[in-house]
Amino acid sequence: MSTGSSDFEKTILVTGGAGFIGTNFVDYFAARHRGIRLIDLDALTYAAHPESFERQAAMPNVVPVQGDICDAALLAEIFEKYDVSGVIHFAAESHVDNSIADPVKFVRTNVMGTAALLDAAKRHWEKTSRLASARFHHISTDEVFGTLGAEGLFTENSPYAPTSPYSASKASADLLVEAYAKTFGLNTTISHCSNNFGPWQHTEKFIPTVIRKCLAHEPIPIYGTGLNIRDWLWVEDHCSAIETIFLHARAGSRYVVSAQCERTNLELARTICALLDRLRPWAGHNYAELIDFVTDRPGHDFRYASSAARIRDELGWQPAGSFEAMLERTLDWYLGHEAAFNQPQSR
């Protein structure tokens, strides 16, 4: 595999490309843009997929690199060696429960790591006279806006009101990105996504947890009453939104990415159980029998829901798949990849 710059029109550094959304994005973008080289920098933490690195190594326009985004020397080496002219920044600790157990770990990766990456980009692009043209796209979350009541939608103008160490760390990273744009002239964009689902998601997350518990015939833990509401987005639709923003959005813009598909946790768990009743019948039982209400977690946000009006109106993006069809596709994927449930848990 050639890594010479002359073989490609540009090189983009993707961080966290062996994680859930990053893995899907690298597969999606690399297939659609053969003339662009992707450098996938991933620390391969517990939530990553080492097999993604193996698959990427065989792709003609992807170079996987294992490393930490907090490693300033490594970042400088990557920017120099590959003459990086764009960044798409996924790498982050993202599980809220883990942020409650170990907030400092989230600050290190999500805040300090973003700062190190911004600084490496600034230094290289100043030196190569690309400060205004080379794009830095930061993947954020709708959780930075806090929680909603029964009505209303988050928009790009919603005030920041994070309620967990995770969302606070992502809000901090967002502000750093905007500060580098205003102070140093970096060409930045930010996207705030709703809850993603699809292949390769770590089994600690809600949908894979429900599937895993069903297949093991174990209790399915549902926090509190199960009436908390989340806004669900098919991961490949998210990938197409990131591609659109990175390639076409104005510098300094922010976009909420949402399919505006709200479900209560209990409703979603029951839907998954009903699908599995059909796809993987359990003799003499229904999977919904396994639903088990457990003590609510601290600071559990009641509702997330976002408007995708700006990205639809300004960039023409919209989700391609229906929630029901994509959820069934997700279940089919996990049923065909049951080894995914052997992923290590947080450490």
Q: How should these model regions be labeled?
A:
Residues 4-12, 25, 32, 38, ...:
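C-terminal substrate-binding subdomain of Rossmann-fold SDR/epimerase-dehydratase oxidoreductases
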Residues 20, 135, 164, 205, ...:
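Amphipathic alpha-helical recognition patches that constitute DNA-binding helices
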Residues 49-52, 96, 150, 156, ...:
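Glycine-rich, flexible loop/turn motifs
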Residues 73, 85, 97, 104, ...:
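Residues in well-ordered alpha-helical elements
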Residues 86, 140-143, 175, 205-209, ...:
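Generic alpha-helical secondary structure signal
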